[in-house]
């Protein structure tokens, strides 16, 4: 019985988080919970109803304003095509009130994109790299684009992602001299010699870890870093080698560039896009861990006040 309650709470937690994230946290927590309980955690269905009610409740002035906005009209026309679903909408007061609240929001480009994504049941997200200097620990998370934050699973501190120009790991290289594409350990803005023509090439991107990375390369890593275990000449003093073997041989930390501590604005909406490493941990276990962490945070805030 206890396991059944935990699973029920878990499913409710996931649906509430996803529903609130679709509207960028503008839905009250209590309202989201009531709607998810009422509609059996079907956040996609409730989201569709809200958008449809918004369309039905739009007054004449707003309609005239929208006609001059092609992006907004595309969203509205796409929703209107589903007439059958509109006819089957439940007469739910909470959904109607929420739709009215959403209709009072200014028609900024940001809000229009939010409605467009919500209509398509999308939560735009990116795979980002995070690194904790104190724990010498690096991980990847899939986080909402509008709020890229992750918590270190070791020290529990929250961090912003590693800057795009400082990311490291398995990089994808495109040599302009011999037109060859290859992969290998590296860091953005740090050159490595092409395996074919030996010309220096910087990685175009750093790839997130995946369970199936494809066949491993037979080429031996090399770069121009001073302490690379297979360095090329002329080496560059102070340049760091990203390869794990070089880090171990020179007793260097695993983290090349740490993340900055996240300064909370109080507007972060916890989501379950992937609150765990991309290549480790079960998603349900991580969500349950996040719930416990949030409860601990609330207890800490109460004790401080």
From Swiss-Prot:
InterPro entries: SHFL
Location in the cell: Cytoplasm; Nucleus; Cytoplasm, P-body
Pfam families named among the record's database cross-references: UPF0515
Protein's GO biological process: innate immune response; negative regulation of translational frameshifting; regulation of translational termination; response to interferon-beta; viral translational frameshifting
Coiled-coil positions: none
Motif Nuclear export signal: positions: 279-288
Top-rank lineage group of the source organism: Eukaryota
Keyword Transmembrane helix: no
Motif window: Nuclear localization signal: 141-157
Gene Ontology MF: a single term: ribosome binding
GO cellular component annotations of the record: cytoplasm; nucleus; P-body
Record flagged with keyword Nucleotide-binding: no
Major localization class: cytoplasm
Keyword list, A-Z: Cytoplasm, Nucleus, RNA-binding
Family, as annotated: Belongs to the SHFL family.
Role summary: Inhibits programmed -1 ribosomal frameshifting (-1PRF) of a variety of mRNAs from viruses and cellular genes. Interacts with the -1PRF signal of target mRNA and translating ribosomes and causes premature translation termination at the frameshifting site. May exhibit antiviral activity.
Protein name: Shiftless antiviral inhibitor of ribosomal frameshifting protein homolog
Source species: Xenopus laevis
Lineage: Eukaryota, Metazoa, Chordata, Craniata, Vertebrata
